[in-house]
Amino acid sequence: MTLQAIKYNNGDLAIIDQLQLPHVEKYVTIHNSEEGWHAIKDMRVRGAPAIAIVAALALASELHGLMAHDKLSPEAEDVQTFVVEKLRYLVSSRPTAVNLSDAARKLEVVVAQSARAPGATGKTVATAFIQAAEEMLVKDVEDNKKIGEHGAQWILKNSLEGHGKATVLTHCNTGSLATSGYGTALGVIRSLASADSLQHAYCTETRPYNQGSRLTAFELVHDALPATLITDSMAAALLASKKAGVNAIVVGADRVAANGDTANKIGTYGLAVLAKYHNVKFLVAAPLTTIDLNTKSGDQIVIEERLASEVTSIRGPRDNTGSEDVELVTVCTAAKGINVWNPAFDVTPAALIDGIITEKGVMEKDSAGMFHLEELF
């Protein structure tokens, strides 16, 4: 059974606290937009599709609570203003992820249209928002499964010529923990496994935040898929290994520019360079909401820089053998006083990408080496 990282029912929202994984599987309840903002900023939830869904549902939960306690303004315009302000606040929690800003824009349109409707009230505007947010949750899962199927079929056709099983390397976490369910790049691996076409999956540790070792490895073990964890610095040796026989690298995306340049977790660019040298297919898996046609190229993408402590220390459980309680501790791993550069993302040039997998299919470059992503819309 695929992991369920986001649980939502009629205003009740709970998410797996990813800061506790893989040591403790604990759900955290989100009641309002402020708690949603902190869950995203503190990386209790991460992954571009997931944070968009959690942000929308956090505000939906807040509106449910206001209506339940009769604290919602009866005026449609007041509720519209309230929702727009909260959405813009939520977007500030992770500016790099286009899914979040895209979802916010769409939801602003929903409440604007609802507020202009004849007889509109605060309740009708709030209800329209809640319905739209809940529909986003359902659609994201459906889109992820389509992405998985399209990606699996492409790999089998283009990397294996229709014969044998695929061995795939992935980076960071792009599964149920990064989306509303199933996953994007990890969804491709799941689809290969469902078709009995997965030979083996490799996942990178993904320093410095270890999303690969903490989260992707957790999902692969949870789903009982044949998988192996490597450190980031082992990727070149893995691709060079005939024994490993990696057929494709599949990664997710936080933002895809109009020309195909892709911002994703730091280390993605390096994997793309290695893939090109070793003649291994390099694919980006992302829903259409991740594609930003207003961003013409990767040099326009704002890259978030994070705390130095993420590089100079590591967090994990104290080894209390035989104890059911897990005590998480932070251990320093670097010389004190050293300067640190910690960009959360890098940009992979479109020239290094063989295909971009969306819910509509796999977009490839034309004979001139150009993506035409506008054709997907």
From Swiss-Prot:
Which Gene3D superfamilies does the entry link to?
translation initiation factor eif-2b, domain 1 (1.20.120.420), Translation initiation factor eif-2b, domain 2 (3.40.50.10470)
Catalysed reactions listed for this entry: 5-(methylsulfanyl)-alpha-D-ribose 1-phosphate = 5-(methylsulfanyl)-D-ribulose 1-phosphate
Question: Which biological processes are named by the entry's GO terms?
Answer: L-methionine salvage from methylthioadenosine
Q: What keywords does the record list, in alphabetical order?
A: Amino-acid biosynthesis, Cytoplasm, Isomerase, Methionine biosynthesis, Nucleus
Recorded metabolic or biological pathway in which this protein acts = Amino-acid biosynthesis; L-methionine biosynthesis via salvage pathway; L-methionine from S-methyl-5-thio-alpha-D-ribose 1-phosphate: step 1/6
Query: What residues correspond to the site Transition state stabilizer?
Result: 172
- What is the role of this chain? Catalyzes the interconversion of methylthioribose-1-phosphate (MTR-1-P) into methylthioribulose-1-phosphate (MTRu-1-P).
Query: Which NCBIfam families does this entry report, sorted A to Z?
Result: eIF-2B_rel, PRK05720.1, salvage_mtnA
What's the protein called, per UniProt? Answer: Methylthioribose-1-phosphate isomerase
Please name the gene that encodes this protein.
mri1
